[in-house]
Amino acid sequence: MQKSLHSKLFKIIGFFGGSFDPIHYGHLKNAAQLKDKLRLSKLFLMPCDKPVHKKQLNFSINQRIDMLHLAIKEFNTLSIDTREIKQNKNSYTINSLKYIQSKYQNNSICLIMGMDSFNTLSSWEECQNFYQYCHLVIMSRPGILTYQKKYGFRLTNIINDLTKQKTGFIFFANNQMLNISSSTIQGKIKSQKNLSGLLPDSIINYINAL
């Protein structure tokens, strides 16, 4: 019997990290769209406890987790990973990647981030080693491609490449992204402006009840 010439393909698991302060439609709709586009077997929203690159957060750990659980009732194809929250210390992505790789040894791992985060990657702890633990997926707007060869990743625009090996590629998703930011929402909360259309009604009700 002739052996198959096809190499093994790996199921892809995505991890979208952030402070989610608060989680909003910009996060949720873009994540759901990306899960479908990349055919991810799972996409985890991974909230951090104490983000190294941000100042004090507006919502507590428990409040942010509560809002994430409310969010995935509407976006039920998404999941939550609370590993970084449970560490109760500064959140270094490299530590999470090492843990994730050890837990999901038979999967391709995608670390998902927006363009703003990618543009600060040079300041992240051990960023030059990320390629050993994951693929990097950047949620960028169509036409935006500012990648230079660094961090050890190889550029690809072929989704199937992410299934052929577990780590090492960078992929620009070119989503039709919603232009919503947590800072805009925080400003509206402080000035008591309408939040409709920016985040799920269940989260708006939660915030209003605080």
UniProtKB/Swiss-Prot annotation:
Belongs to the NadD family. Signal peptide: none annotated. InterPro entries: Cyt_trans-like, NadD/NMNAT, Rossmann-like_a/b/a_fold. Pathway: Cofactor biosynthesis; NAD(+) biosynthesis; deamido-NAD(+) from nicotinate D-ribonucleotide: step 1/1. PANTHER family: NICOTINATE-NUCLEOTIDE ADENYLYLTRANSFERASE-RELATED, PHOSPHOPANTETHEINE ADENYLYLTRANSFERASE. Pfam families: CTP_transf_like (PF01467). It comes from the Bacteria. Keywords: ATP-binding, NAD, Nucleotide-binding, Nucleotidyltransferase, Pyridine nucleotide biosynthesis, Transferase. Its EC number is 2.7.7.18. It catalyses: nicotinate beta-D-ribonucleotide + ATP + H(+) = deamido-NAD(+) + diphosphate. GO terms for biological process: NAD biosynthetic process. Catalyzes the reversible adenylation of nicotinate mononucleotide (NaMN) to nicotinic acid adenine dinucleotide (NaAD). This is Probable nicotinate-nucleotide adenylyltransferase. GO terms for molecular function: ATP binding; nicotinate-nucleotide adenylyltransferase activity.
